[in-house]
Structures are given as C-alpha cells and as structure tokens.
Amino acid sequence: MTAQFNACPEKTEEPMADPRKPRNAFTPWDRRELPGSFTVEESARRIGNYKWIEMRLFEALGGWVATVPELDVKLRLGTHCYKHAWHAELWHKRLPELREMNPERLTQPANDRVAAFMEAVAEPTDPELTIEKLVGVYRVLIPHKISAYTYHLNNTSTITDAPTIRSLKMALDDEFEDWRDGEMLLQSMMLSKADVERASARQTALESLMVEAGGICGPGTIGDAYDLSTR
C-alpha cells in the first residue's frame, strides 16, 4: 500500500491584531505614572537648591584640604571635594532645560536658615577641629542630602524626568560612598569619651539648625509624614 502525502501543508490564516482593541502603552509589569509629584517649577527650585548646596560644600572641603593636619583626611577631602564640584555642574546642566528658567536666579538656598546651616558647617577652620569638620559633613549634611535626593528620585516621573533621575542616581552613588569614607575616618579619630562628646555636641547643634530649616530644600524636603491627604 502506498502512503499518500500532501506536497504542502494546508495554510491557515493568521489572526490579525484588532485595531478596535488597543493595547496599553506600557506592559503590565511597567505601568508608569506620568505626572510625578513635582511641577516643573518645583523640580527646578529643588535642583537650584541642590546646586547651591554642592557649591558651598565644594568650597568648604577645598578650604579644609589645606589646613587639616591628618594626611589621610586631607586626601579623602580632596577627592570628595571635586565630586561635589561635579555635582554642582550636573545640577547646573539640568536647570536650562526647565522652561528656560534663569539658572543663576534658581541657584540659591531654600531659605535663610539653610544658608545659616551651611555657614555653621563650614565654620570650623582651626586645624585641631577635624572631628567637628567631619561630623558636620558626614553625620549631618550628607545624610540630609541623601534623604532629599532619594525623596526626589522616588517621587518624580520616570517618563518626563528621566534625565533628572539619572543625575540623582549618579549623585547618590557618590554620596553613599563619601558618607561611608567620612564615617570611617570619624570613627578612627574618636579615641576617648571627650572625643565622643565633641562629636555629639557638634551633631546636636547642626541637626537643630537643619530642623529649623526644614531640610536642604526647606519644609517638605522629604515630604510630610503627617499629611494624611497623601495616603
């Protein structure tokens, strides 16, 4: 008996996409939200505050490099100093893209209390005050910067604000690395109860100023945990 074979399999018509049934612009595992929590003006104001803070920190660290007697601290401050200069440039480049707002007008402290806080951070100039210098930067200022940058990152639009998100992530990488360096330097310098008390007194004084300022971007820097309307 001879088997019979078809020369070609019978073709079936492929179903076509139904234009009357549109698909979502984003996949089910990536359903982004367009608006974000910041208006263009609010984002620009925050970025201007970031730039001002980074510039002031660059100046403070640069001034200390020449006077701190501890060589290991001197080298680390020099490295960190130029990171903050780069961050200031990074934020400056974001400002002109925001509705042609004037970058110089936006480059300012959030309020007078933030300006007073930064003056206090930079105030210790005597060579024997290295502990006070390190506490101000690595136990107060940088943790507050990390909080502000993280809040901004978590609350802005991944669609319309992707360049700012990229800048925030790069800055945060540096901030975490520098915070770790600074904290380890500080721990290595505290050898007595008196050193611990110096560090504690310095941190308390600066944290009090920051509370009065409301954060590096003023009140609302990291949102309001007591605002029940945002639940």
Language-model regions, residue ranges each:
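Acidic, low-complexity proline/glycine-rich segments
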Residues: 5, 11-30, 52, 103-115
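Acidic/His metal-coordination segments adjacent to aromatic residues that form catalytic metal sites
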Residues: 28-48, 106-141, 209, 213
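Conserved alpha-helical segments that form or flank metal/cofactor-binding pockets of metalloenzymes
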Residues: 75-118
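Amphipathic alpha-helical assembly/interaction segments
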Residues: 33, 92, 132-136, 143, ...
